[in-house]
């Protein structure tokens, strides 16, 4: 992927006009059709963005809402999914309320009932993560069906979902979905996409006029973009296709289960990931007595040459570990040894 990006920059620097056109052709003829097919969408429903954060802002700021309209989000949103709604509240008088969702998730029915309990006559939309920063996997299809039956728009943050397991956007039934390609999809930094369901377009007002080469309504800025980076998505998509997302799902789950087994050997370790159907295959979250999660981040980089993420939600002083297909059991063993060493300091 890195070499594909470099090749693109060499091409566009050597021959600016033809190099750019060749890259644009690769984007429109290979990247966009493959992206749509991979995620169960029509090409016209997808706009390329620089990341999920940009896509989340675009979907949030373009949604047709009036002063006093209400949107429900959850207490587990990433800041990138929370801040755009604060902009809508400040600029347009939209009421944004948080639905408390416990960590770990209890059940599909519990998640649905918590949303249902908060709906009022002013509620117009619900917004939530497909997979949270802590690795909790929301029942997206059930939530989107719930929203549609009540005439509500559903907006999903898929930054931590795409690439961990197969995602079919039409099957999920969401109205908008934002994703990053540089995380689990092996894409170059600076790539993501926004999906807006065709039947929901009248609820999302685009901020930009479509360019001459547009395949549909533009929700992301037209004009000159980072074409070498976007064209390199063809390489990352082909790589993921060779792996097979079902195989990625299985491998990530295998490594995550091995990690959980090793963590269970540590005294005072509490797993917070929840059951398999409500947790992402490659994300494990836990709390370890005697270990400060914030302080452990630099310690584990030093002791185990491993980057981890702290997770502070619902009073938990937790740690998140992400295991992708390229990780090994030996690396997990080194991490667990590092955790024990860090706790003893």
Where are the predicted features?
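Pyridoxal 5′-phosphate
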Residues: 1-345
């Amino acid at each position: 992927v890195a070499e594909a990006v470099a090749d693109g920059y060499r091409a566009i620097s050597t021959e600016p006009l033809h190099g750019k056109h060749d890259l644009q052709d690769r984007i429109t003829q290979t990247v966009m059709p493959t992206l749509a097919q991979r995620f169960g969408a029509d090409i016209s429903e997808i706009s390329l963005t620089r990341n999920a954060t940009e896509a989340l802002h675009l979907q949030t700021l373009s949604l047709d809402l009036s002063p006093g309209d209400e949107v429900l989000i959850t207490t587990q949103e990433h800041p990138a999914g929370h801040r755009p709604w604060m902009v809508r509240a400040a600029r347009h008088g939209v009421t944004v309320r948080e639905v408390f969702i416990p960590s770990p998730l209890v059940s599909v029915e519990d998640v649905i009932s918590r949303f249902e309990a908060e709906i009022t006559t002013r509620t117009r939309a619900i917004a939530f993560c497909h997979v949270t920063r802590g690795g909790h996997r929301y029942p997206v299809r059930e939530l989107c069906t719930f929203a549609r039956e009540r005439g509500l728009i559903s907006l999903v943050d898929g930054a931590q979902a795409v690439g961990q397991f197969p995602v079919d956007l039409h099957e999920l039934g969401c109205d908008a979905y934002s994703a990053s390609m540089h995380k689990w999809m092996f894409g170059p930094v600076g790539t993501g996409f926004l999906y807006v369901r065709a039947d929901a377009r009248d609820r999302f007002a685009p901020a930009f006029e479509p360019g001459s080469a547009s395949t549909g309504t533009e929700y992301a800025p037209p004009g000159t973009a980072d074409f070498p980076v976007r064209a390199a998505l063809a390489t990352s998509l082909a790589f993921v296709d060779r792996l097979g997302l079902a195989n990625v799902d299985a491998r990530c789950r295998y490594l995550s289960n091995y990690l959980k087994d090793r963590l269970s050997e540590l005294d005072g370790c509490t797993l917070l990931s929840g059951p398999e159907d409500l947790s992402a295959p490659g994300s494990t979250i836990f709390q370890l007595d005697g270990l400060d999660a914030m302080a452990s981040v630099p310690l584990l980089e030093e002791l185990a040459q491993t980057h981890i993420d702290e997770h502070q939600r619902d009073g938990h002083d937790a740690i998140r570990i992400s295991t992708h297909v390229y990780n090994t059991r030996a690396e997990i063993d080194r991490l667990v040894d590092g955790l024990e060493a860090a706790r003893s300091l």
